[in-house]
Amino acid sequence: MQIKLANPRGFCAGVDRAIEIVNRALEVFGPPIYVRHEVVHNKFVVEDLRSRGAIFVEELDQVPDDVIVIFSAHGVSQAVRTEAAGRGLKVFDATCPLVTKVHIEVARYSRDGRECILIGHAGHPEVEGTMGQYDASNGGAIYLVEDEEDVASLQVRNPDSLAFVTQTTLSMDDTSRVIDALRKRFPAIGGPRKDDICYATQNRQDAVKQLADECDVVLVVGSPNSSNSNRLRELAERMATPAYLIDGAEDMQQGWFEGVERIGITAGASAPEVLVRGVIQQLQAWGATGADELAGREENITFSMPKELRVKSLL
């Protein structure tokens, strides 16, 4: 059995920044540091930060007064920001800047009283945060659609004053079809020059397609609640390549690889490389050879840290 590695894979700039914000806050201020929602959707990362003093909560009413709270990479609604400010909580915002970009778009449509459609998965924290940027008091409304069927049944007030945005971690292929359906049903709809799916999501989806084309089975390292990791598994399966989403080497079954010659490995944007290395080691113990990395798109994007953490870390 030969191992092939997708390129790029694993951490993106937004995830790197979010994890580093929690790490720096722990270093500068000491534990406990409260984090609203899992800072990124990865079990290994969350447990590591928890072991060092991060406390993960789902709502601010679980946060005591006079502590530091960090908003996760997925972003939060304006109502959550207002609640935190009203309580005087010290907040560090780990929202991915590419998610913030979508928030700004939604807020602009809201101010203009323009109806907005969000393409995304119901219940995902990024979707909840993005929906929560819209203030309907200006006369508009925001709607959530997941697929073409939702578009077909959607009723809006003013189809001539309509715009769309997208969740950043969707399948590019699925999203393209939904956008086409929106444009067909609402010809006057506006939106970003291109969809809001982030560069890292696009790159990892392109890479897993190449991987699935060259391999007999694909392993996606990522947690079950990771949207982008699930999309990677789905893409491989759509190419008729068996694919498995695993948190790490302990989730693998040796029987998956009977008769397999080429094993492909990728990782979601919130999965650290140490987990990939663990998977490789286990496969090699089962007789796999090599770990050849495919050619791929280079990523050199970085996002800046909050000023207070950036300055204090240098003192």
Swiss-Prot record:
**EC number, UniProt record:** 1.17.7.4
Query: Per UniProt, where does [4Fe-4S] cluster bind?
Result: C12, C96, C198
- The entry marks the following residues as binding dimethylallyl diphosphate, namely H41, H74, H124, S226, S227, N228, S270
Which cofactors does it use? Answer: [4Fe-4S] cluster
An individual GO BP term: dimethylallyl diphosphate biosynthetic process
Q: Which domain of life is it from?
A: Bacteria
Does the entry feature the keyword GTP-binding, yes or no? no
What molecular functions are annotated in GO for this chain?
4 iron, 4 sulfur cluster binding; 4-hydroxy-3-methylbut-2-enyl diphosphate reductase activity; metal ion binding
Cofactor comment: Binds 1 [4Fe-4S] cluster per subunit.
> Which reaction does this chain catalyze?
isopentenyl diphosphate + 2 oxidized [2Fe-2S]-[ferredoxin] + H2O = (2E)-4-hydroxy-3-methylbut-2-enyl diphosphate + 2 reduced [2Fe-2S]-[ferredoxin] + 2 H(+); dimethylallyl diphosphate + 2 oxidized [2Fe-2S]-[ferredoxin] + H2O = (2E)-4-hydroxy-3-methylbut-2-enyl diphosphate + 2 reduced [2Fe-2S]-[ferredoxin] + 2 H(+)
Q: Where does (2E)-4-hydroxy-3-methylbut-2-enyl diphosphate bind?
A: H41, H74, H124, T168, S226, S227, N228, S270
Query: Which of this chain's residues are annotated to bind isopentenyl diphosphate?
Result: H41, H74, H124, S226, S227, N228, S270
What Gene3D superfamilies is this protein classified in? Answer: 3.40.50.11270, 4-hydroxy-3-methylbut-2-enyl diphosphate reductase, catalytic domain
CDD domains linked: lytB_ispH
**Which pathway does the protein contribute to?**
Isoprenoid biosynthesis; dimethylallyl diphosphate biosynthesis; dimethylallyl diphosphate from (2E)-4-hydroxy-3-methylbutenyl diphosphate: step 1/1; Isoprenoid biosynthesis; isopentenyl diphosphate biosynthesis via DXP pathway; isopentenyl diphosphate from 1-deoxy-D-xylulose 5-phosphate: step 6/6
- Annotated catalytic residues: E126 (proton donor)
Q: Which InterPro entries match?
A: LytB/IspH
Alphabetized UniProt keyword annotations? 4Fe-4S, Iron, Iron-sulfur, Isoprene biosynthesis, Metal-binding, Oxidoreductase
Task: Please name the NCBIfam families in this protein's record.
Answer: ispH_lytB (TIGR00216), PRK01045.1-2 (NF002188), PRK01045.1-4 (NF002190)
> What protein family is recorded?
Belongs to the IspH family.
Question: Which PANTHER family does this one have?
Answer: 4-HYDROXY-3-METHYLBUT-2-ENYL DIPHOSPHATE REDUCTASE
Q: What does this protein do?
A: Catalyzes the conversion of 1-hydroxy-2-methyl-2-(E)-butenyl 4-diphosphate (HMBPP) into a mixture of isopentenyl diphosphate (IPP) and dimethylallyl diphosphate (DMAPP). Acts in the terminal step of the DOXP/MEP pathway for isoprenoid precursor biosynthesis.
Stated name of the protein: 4-hydroxy-3-methylbut-2-enyl diphosphate reductase
* Gene that encodes it: ispH
